[in-house]
From Swiss-Prot:
Top-level taxonomy: Bacteria, Bacillati, Bacillota, Clostridia, Eubacteriales
Domain ABC transporter: 8-243, 254-499
Stated role: Part of the ABC transporter complex MglABC involved in galactose/methyl galactoside import. Responsible for energy coupling to the transport system.
Protein name per its UniProtKB record: Galactose/methyl galactoside import ATP-binding protein MglA
MF terms (GO), sorted A to Z: ATP binding; ATP hydrolysis activity
Coiled coil regions, renumbered to chain: none
Cell wall biogenesis/degradation as UniProt keyword: no
Species per Swiss-Prot/TrEMBL record: Clostridium perfringens (strain 13 / Type A)
EC number: 7.5.2.11
Length: 515
C-alpha cells in the first residue's frame, strides 16, 4: 500500500559498481509540494541515488514509484518526459546560444517545417514571469551571471511540466541576495505542488527551506526527520556517525617573524586600491568581505594572474616580481583557486597526473620522457600525507569526493615546497567532515611555518581557523582584526565601510591593525 501523500517513493534501492556497494537498501519518500533535503558527507551516496531516480544509473534492486505508479526510467530523457528534472551543480548550457534556445534545445516548437520562434519566446517569457526571473530570453547565456544561469536551468525544469525537481548544490556560487531569490522561486514551485529534492552541505539553508531531511552515510539510509525537529549539531552527528564537539581544530601553531609585506598594491584596472598588509611565518591570515570586495582579485594579483598596477610585494625583506604565475611559483607562492572543478583539477585525468602537474617539468628526464618511478613516489606522498581516500593513483580525480579532490589540489602545490599559500574558498562544496580535515591540514601547514592567506565567505570559518582577518570593502582594506577578539558584527561593519565611496584612494597608513 503506497502512502497517497507521497509523490515519490524509492524503496530499498541498492546499486553496486565493481568492488563498491554505492547504495545499500536505501528508501526515500518525498511528499507532494514539499522541499525534501538530502544530506550526507561526500561519498554518502546522494548523487548515486538521484542518478538512479533520473535514469542515469539503473539500480541492482529496489523499486521507484511516482504518484503510486511503478516507474523504471531507461535514461534521463525518459525521466524528463515523465516529470522528473535535475538541476546539476555543474550547469550544462550552450553558452554561445541564447537563453530560449537553451531552454528548448532538442524540442523546439514548430510551425510547419520551421521553428516557431514567437511561440518559443512567449512560452519562455511566461515561465520567467511566473517564477519572477528577470532575464531576457534573447540574451546570450554567456552574458548571464551564475545566478541567472541557475534560474534558467530551473525554468527549463519547469518547462518539462516537472512534478519532481532535483537541485544539486544550487547555492554553491550564489550571494546571500541571490539565495534569497532562489528560495522565493522554490516556495512558488512548492505552492504549485512541485516537489523539490534539495542537496546541499549548507545546514543553515537546509533548516530554513526544507520540510523534511533525509540523511545518508556510507551508502545507507540513516534518518528522515522533520526539519523543524533538527539542529545543526544533530545533523552533523547523523552525517558523520559521531559528535563533532568542535567544528574547528585547536589553533596550536605560533606565528613568528614577518615573511611577506604587501605595500599599496593596486591592480592595472584599479579595482584593488592600495592594499597593504603583513603576513608572518606560520600565520593564517583570513580575508573577509562582501561580494565585490575584490578578495579573489587580491590573491590573483599576488600570484600574477591579474596584472599589477602599482605597489610592492616583499618576501623576506626583498622585492619580488610576481608579474606572471610562473614567476610567482618560482618565488615560492602557490594558489588554490576558488573554482576547483574549472581551474584546479583535470577531472578526466588520474590522480597521479593531477598531483604532479604544478611541477611537471621537474619530472622530465634527459631524454624528454617522464620519470614514472618518481611520479609514483611523489603521488603516493600526496595521497598519504593529505590522507586522500582513493583505491589507486590511477583513479580519475573527477570521481573522488570534493574533499579528496581539494586535498590533492593542495598536495600538488606542496610538492613545490611553497612558502606562501594562497587559498581561495578552500572548503567550498565540501561536506562538514571533510571540512574539518581541511582545517586540520591548514593548521599543520602553519605549524610548518608556511604563511597562509585564506579567502572565505563563511564567517565562522574565518573566525575558527585564522589568526587575523583582513577585511576588504570595495577593493580597499577597511581593517585588520584579531580573529580571537573580533565579532561577526564588527567584520560586517568593516565590510560595508567603503560601499558608498566612488572615488579617491584610501591611505593605507590610516588603517589600524588590531593584533
Amino acid at each position: 500500500m503506497k502512502d497517497s501523500s507521497n509523490l515519490l517513493e524509492m524503496r530499498n534501492i541498492s546499486k553496486e559498481f565493481p568492488g563498491v556497494k554505492a547504495l545499500d537498501n536505501v528508501t526515500l519518500k518525498v511528499k507532494k509540494g514539499s522541499v525534501h533535503a538530502l544530506m550526507g558527507e561526500n561519498g554518502a551516496g546522494k548523487s548515486t541515488l538521484m542518478k538512479c531516480l533520473f535514469g542515469i544509473y539503473h539500480p541492482n534492486s529496489g523499486e521507484i514509484f511516482i504518484s503510486g505508479q511503478k516507474v523504471q526510467f531507461k535514461n534521463s530523457k525518459h525521466a524528463l518526459d515523465n516529470g522528473v528534472s535535475m538541476v546539476h551543480q555543474e550547469l550544462n548550457q550552450v553558452r554561445e546560444r541564447n537563453v530560449m534556445d537553451n531552454l528548448w534545445l532538442g524540442r523546439y516548437p514548430k510551425k510547419g517545417l520551421f521553428i516557431d520562434e514567437k511561440k518559443m519566446y512567449d512560452e519562455t517569457e511566461k515561465i520567467f514571469k511566473d517564477l519572477d526571473i528577470n532575464v531576457n530570453p534573447r540574451d546570450k547565456v554567456s552574458t548571464l551571471s551564475v545566478s541567472q544561469m541557475q534560474m534558467v536551468e530551473i525554468a527549463k525544469a519547469v518547462s518539462y511540466n516537472s512534478k519532481i525537481i532535483v537541485m544539486d548544490e544550487p547555492t554553491s556560487s550564489l550571494t546571500e541576495k541571490e539565495v534569497s531569490h532562489l528560495f522565493k522561486i522554490i516556495n512558488k514551485l512548492r505552492k504549485q505542488g512541485i516537489s523539490i529534492i534539495y542537496i546541499s552541505h549548507k545546514m543553515e539553508e537546509i533548516l530554513e527551506i526544507s520540510d523534511e531531511v533525509t540523511i545518508m552515510r556510507d551508502g545507507k539510509w540513516i534518518a528522515t526527520e522533520k526539519a523543524s525537529d533538527l539542529t545543526m549539531d544533530l545533523i552533523i552527528k547523523l552525517m558523520v556517525g559521531r559528535e563533532l564537539t568542535d567544528r574547528f581544530p585547536k589553533k596550536d601553531h605560533i606565528p613568528k617573524e614577518t615573511t611577506l609585506e604587501v605595500n599599496n598594491l593596486s591592480d592595472a584596472k584599479n579595482e584593488l586600491k592600495n592594499v597593504s598588509f603583513k603576513l608572518r611565518k606560520g600565520e593564517i591570515l583570513g580575508i573577509a568581505g562582501l561580494v565585490g570586495a575584490k578578495r579573489t582579485e587580491t590573491l590573483e594579483t599576488l600570484f600574477g594572474l591579474r596584472e599589477k598596477g602599482s605597489g610592492d610585494i616583499i618576501l623576506h625583506g626583498k622585492k619580488v616580481d610576481n608579474s606572471k604565475p610562473f614567476k610567482a611559483m618560482q618565488n615560492g607562492f602557490a594558489l588554490v583557486t576558488e573554482e576547483r572543478r574549472q581551474t584546479g583539477i583535470f577531472g578526466k585525468l588520474p590522480i597521479d597526473f593531477n598531483s604532479i602537474i604544478a611541477n611537471i617539468d621537474s619530472y622530465k628526464t634527459s631524454t624528454g620522457l617522464l620519470a614514472n618511478e618518481r611520479i609514483s613516489k611523489d603521488t603516493q606522498w600526496v595521497i598519504d600525507s593529505m590522507k586522500v581516500k582513493t583505491p589507486s593513483q590511477k583513479t580519475l580525480i573527477g570521481s573522488l569526493s570534493g574533499g579528496n579532490q581539494q586535498k590533492i589540489v593542495i598536495g600538488k602545490w606542496l610538492l613545490r615546497k611553497p612558502e606562501i599559500l594562497l587559498l581561495d574558498e578552500p572548503t567550498r562544496g565540501i561536506d562538514v567532515g571533510a571540512k574539518f580535515e581541511i582545517y586540520q591540514l591548514i593548521n599543520e601547514l602553519a605549524k610548518e611555518d608556511k604563511g597562509i592567506i585564506m579567502v572565505s565567505s563563511e564567517m565562522p570559518e574565518l573566525l575558527g581557523v585564522c589568526d587575523r582577518i583582513l577585511v576588504m570593502s570595495n577593493g580597499r582594506v577597511s581593517g585588520i582584526v584579531n580573529a580571537n577578539e573580533t565579532t561577526q558584527e564588527e567584520i560586517m561593519h568593516l565590510s560595508a565601510k567603503y560601499l558608498s565611496v566612488t572615488g579617491g584612494v584610501n591611505n593605507a597608513n590610516q588603517i589600524k591593525e588590531k593584533v
